[in-house]
Amino acid sequence: MSSTMKPHNEAMRMQRWTIVMLSLLVSLAGCTEADDLVGEEPVVTNEEPLVNSFPIWNGTDHANTTLDSSAFANRSYLAYFSAPWCAHCESTLDAYDSIIPNGSIAIFSMEGREEYANMSEWHNQTETNLNRTFDRPFILHPELAKEVRVQSIPHAVFVNAQGYAFHVEIGKETNLTYIQEVWSATETAFFSPENGWNNHINNG
């Protein structure tokens, strides 16, 4: 046998020994006392389906009207997050506006910088760019956007009548058929801890 094989065999034996020791350590992990090995029974967990309540909010819209989440109590609505500088978001807002009933959209600006704080200007700019009237509240609310963890816009949260975030749509969406399906599902969506959601959305 060549002398060059001997170091190789030694290395192989050390590797095997290391693997055996690691296996023993893993098997003992979490069992540091004798009591840990006695009387253990299977742990049964009843995990509830995940659901998030949409935060309670209040603010003043572009017409200086005070508005809060209680105005949408016991009915579905769309919380739409964007910013005045997001020109490409307008086509999505236009699509949502054509489907969602009057009084069922709240438009929030996530932009906290002072030069974008005028909601009346944003509202007028939207009407000019879309070439039509736009009767929805525009509300400055970067704090709510942070609470909802808005990172990309447009960011639309479909809130059901229980106040739960039923569906979140991020990015451009102009498929009116899909938006109608999501809205219809939101209006009939109900969450129970025992059964979860009664409706589900297939992403468009």
Give the residues covered by each predicted segment.
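Secretory targeting signatures
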Residues: 1-50, 204
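N-linked glycosylation sites
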Residues: 58, 64, 74, 102, ...
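Short acidic-hydrophobic, aromatic-tinged amphipathic segments that line or gate anion-handling sites
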Residues: 60, 135-142
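Short active-site neighborhood of thiol/selenol oxidoreductases, capturing the structured segment around
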Residues: 67-90, 106-108
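Loop/turn elements at helix/coil->beta-strand transitions in domains of secreted/extracellular proteins
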Residues: 73-77, 101-106, 134-136, 153, ...
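Structural microenvironment flanking redox-active thiols in thiol-disulfide oxidoreductases
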Residues: 90-129, 140-147, 197-201
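Thiol/disulfide oxidoreductase modules built on the thioredoxin-like
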Residues: 140-187
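Short, low-complexity, Pro/Ser/Thr/Gly-rich segments in the mature regions of secreted, periplasmic
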Residues: 188-204
